[in-house]
Design a protein with these regions (language model features):
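C-terminal substrate-binding/active-site "lid" region of AdoMet-derived donor-dependent transferases
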Residues: 2-4, 10, 155-158, 203-271
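N-terminal auxiliary segments of SAM/dcSAM-dependent transferases
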Residues: 2-94
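Residue-level signature of catalytic and energy-coupling elements of molecular machines
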Residues: 107, 126, 192, 269
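Helix-to-beta-strand junctions that scaffold the AdoMet/dcAdoMet cofactor pocket
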Residues: 117, 140-141, 212-216
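Conserved class I S-adenosyl-L-methionine
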Residues: 117-128, 143-147
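Conserved SAM-binding loop of SAM-dependent methyltransferases across substrates and taxa
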Residues: 129-142
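S-adenosyl-L-methionine
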Residues: 147-201
């Protein structure tokens, strides 16, 4: 026997005191055997996915599952934007993605009152293809009505197809910068929602609210800083818009929408 072998044997004997030590089971073996983990081991375990149930959100007509927002689907089985549908207790819900909707980003940032209620009349300026508008359609229900305005024929065509299925939406091909064009076609609204990428977006919002927003109604303005001035810091532009709105309305909420919506904020006012 070589000296190295003898030295190794002596070391093993000193470590075990002459007895064979049992092997410590790994985490998987302990889990199979029903054993408990130490505090240190538990801290290294992957977090288990929790099963959340759908709960009413503190914002009217919205629901929450974990940190995700949902509306009750007005047309069960239909997902016009390939959104996730969740069925629970005989109801179907649509997932409202904050990366696609500034309304969702606003609520997840802590806004507690959007002013949107079941049965409301909503004037949506800059409706585009109708993603957020379709969720507002869920929120206001069949008793409500949403006027969707956009000047682009291509996106308005998509919105027309959406409105054919959702009877509480009315498409209008018009420029929100010229509200006089649709004065005779739009009634007073409970809510004015604007999402327009124009330099004078604050002025457009004020003009439309003065014409169409009823006394005590709510206005929601999505401010796109880079559409106003690319040379100024977004926060400076947000403050400028806030000052303009405060001269006319009561500002009840203001949220910067980072990181879901870059260089955007949302302002909620009451007339």
């Amino acid at each position: 026997m070589s000296p190295n072998t003898r030295t190794g044997m002596h070391r093993r004997e000193r470590r075990t005191n002459g007895r064979e030590q049992p092997r410590k089971p790994n985490q998987d073996e302990r889990k199979r055997e029903g054993g408990s983990f130490s505090h240190q081991e538990q801290s290294r375990l992957p977090e288990q996915k929790k099963e959340w149930s759908m709960q009413p959100h503190h914002v009217f007509e919205l629901y929450q599952r974990g940190r995700h927002l949902f509306t009750k689907n007005l047309l069960p089985g239909k997902a016009p934007f390939a959104e996730q549908l969740v069925r629970e207790k005989g109801e179907e819900y649509r997932h409202l993605d904050p990366r696609r909707s500034k309304l969702a980003a606003l609520i997840l940032k802590g806004c507690t009152n959007t002013g949107i209620r079941k049965g409301n009349i909503v004037l949506y300026l800059g409706v585009s293809h109708g993603y957020t508008a379709s969720f507002i359609s869920d929120m206001i229900g069949n008793e409500g009505l949403l006027f969707g305005i956009d000047p682009a024929p291509r996106v308005m065509r998509d919105f027309v197809f959406l409105a054919e299925a959702r009877k509480n939406m009315a498409p209008l091909l018009a420029d929100a910068n010229h509200p006089e064009e649709y004065v005779g076609r739009v009634c007073l609204a409970d809510v004015v929602y604007q999402d327009i990428a124009q330099r004078n977006q604050a002025e457009i919002f004020i003009k439309n609210c003065q014409l169409f927003l009823r006394k005590g109604g709510y206005g929601l303005l999505a401010v796109k800083a880079r559409s106003i001035d690319v040379t100024k810091r977004p926060k400076v532009l947000f403050e400028d818009v806030l000052r303009q709105l405060e001269k006319v309305f009561t500002v009840i909420d203001f949220r910067i929408l980072e990181p879901e919506q870059r260089d955007h904020c949302m302002i909620v006012v009451k007339k």
